[in-house]
Amino acid sequence: MIKRRDFVKQLAITGIGTGLMANPVSQLKLMSSGNQKEIKLGVIGLAVHSAAFSTFLNDKDKKDDLAGCRIEALYHPPGNPDVEFTIKQLAEFKSTVETAGVKIVSSVDELLSMVDGVLIETNDGRPHMEQVLPVLKAGKPVFVDKPVAEDLSGVIRIYNAAAEYNVPIFSSSSLRYGSRPQEINKTKKNQVLGADTYSPASLEPSHTDLYWYGIHGVEMLYTVMGTGCQEVWQIGHSKGVDVLTGVWENDRVGIFRGIREGKRDYGGTVFMNDDIVELGSFEGYRPLVVKIVEFFTTGQSPVSKDETLEIYAFMTAANISKLKGGKRVSVTELKKEFGINT
């Protein structure tokens, strides 16, 4: 099983249109049908995912499930110095995307003039609203990588803006699309009694705790449990770990462990009526890239707005619980407070 950090290391070593304003969804479908040209995508932000996605999508020998899209151009805006990649890392990412045939451009406007859809890949959630708004105003569907924003209000503003401009938006962790989480999600979710998941959970002070990295394990939890978490409490928080418990409808229980000390990996266990299933670890970025292609070619997000907003509300409630010494926090009430439909 490939390790996520090993994939990133290997990637670094190997170097591996306009006119959509009226109806971006129908026009993308038209462009991706029959013998039409591939949908041209633009990327905002040099990052690990920019390099990986460019390598997959611009591979001349890619399989049919990646057909329909290619990355045409990339713009890298100045980043906040507290979370920006090193000069060496940025140079490696730039080399990889250019090797894949991606043109580096000097502005968002230049990028938007060249592409049909956009991926926001800056690793910092704080500037995402500023970066995504011109894309939405141009009517171009957008994938926003995690974290969508630095806090729940920011996440909601971005999704509300997408709704205002009637533009498709999609966000997801790659861990959602592991083979075992997907098998349970598609065929056995109604049998799930509860689940435990874990992932690395490094913290970034400018972001709500789990938004920065713990979201990977939280999204695995939601993939198998579904929406409907009613309350959450953080039963443990230290330098090395976060442990939190959520209660779903029908008294189903989900537990997430965020790891900062010791061996860092991804995984979990799902408890069902007649089986106990191990979820497995990180399987690479390709399964997510397949879903990104699906999104841009159909105009339909594989993950609903309601589920994405609840995931971020869940992580926000966990943070509130931590600040209150581990008290239970109602996810349902928090969603109402922030105007998230329940």
Model-derived features: positions:
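C-terminal active-site/capping subdomain that shapes the small-molecule cofactor and substrate pocket
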Residues: G267-T342
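Rossmann-like dinucleotide-binding domain that binds NAD(P)(H)
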Residues: A195-K263, D306-L309
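Aromatic/hydrophobic pocket-lining residues that form π-stacking "cages" and hydrophobic walls in ligand
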Residues: Q131, I158, A317
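A contiguous active-site-proximal alpha/beta segment in oxidoreductase catalytic domains
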Residues: V148-H207
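A general structural signal for well-ordered alpha-helical segments in protein cores
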Residues: S50, P181, G217-V218, Y285, ...
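Short helix/strand-capping hinge loops at secondary-structure junctions
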Residues: G139-P141, K146-P147
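Hydrophobic residues in well-ordered beta-strands that form the structural core
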Residues: S106, V144, I169-S171
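N-terminal glycine-/serine-/threonine-rich beta1-alpha1-beta2 phosphate-ribose binding loop
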Residues: I2-A138, A163-E164, H237, K324, ...
